[in-house]
Amino acid sequence: MGDIVHALPVAYDIKKHYPDCELSWVVEESFTDIPKLSPFVDKLVVTAFRRWRKNIFSSSVRGEILAVRRALAEAKYDIVIDLQGLIRTAVVARWAGVESVGYSKENIKEPLAAHFYSRTLPVSNKLVPVVRYRTMAAQALGYPIENEDLHYGLDVKPMTPTGVRAPYAALTVNTSRAEKLWPKSRWTEVARELADDGIMSVLFWGNDKERAYCEQIASSVPGQVVVLPRLSLRAIAEVIAGARCLLGVDTGLTHLGAALGIPSVGIIVGTSAELFSLVSESACATVGDNGVIPQPEEVLAAMHSVLAQAAVA
């Protein structure tokens, strides 16, 4: 999901330089809500690789794959740009039957993917994802990259959840990789400090394990932390858009908060702060680094700093 959020400014860039173009976005079915938030995306082409690979030989799956291939071929695109650089995304780009552009094999996560493209570009994999994706699209289409003109362009109406009083903070505590989790005790301490400042906290989850983790945090700060019901990505975006601030580990929802322009603090534990720091049009900060676990005091200080910056912006 983080890759999708990081690619959103590309849609704005392309429409800025080619306002009359029709822009399609290929996206996995579980993440369609994210590009739908952008007014610069005209059409979605939906894949289901996570589901397909579980039953790849069934006739229904083969039919779905054929339908996607047909849709891509019949669209008669002028160009396809693969921002993700995986074998499966390179294959999808090839299905369109037109020029496909991707990363060179020295700068791609799965080097075999480079062999599927019509043209490759040496866009460094050492760039932060937002800059990498914007650079790739700019070089592929021949327009200048303007780093100061970052625009995610999300169209989201804020929503305060039932049972939550404003102001509230959105805490994105879960992630698919255990090494990126911040210790539960530190989340509890942050939630208590927020409560002392009159700020409730809301938590999100996507499976039973994540819900249990959220409930353990909430039980340590009774009445001040609300574990929300399972929500769609669209609904989560609306809740985040209504928050006073967002604090979260390196996960897609945290980057979504930054994309929405909410004062945000990213907590890095098991990834590179150089590559995965938050990038926003508004006030944001990142604390910690790979193997460097930040203290609650650092997170709270960063939160107060971004809130102060947002207040004078």
Pin down the residues of each PLM region.
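Catalytic machinery of carbohydrate-active enzymes
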Residues: 1-313
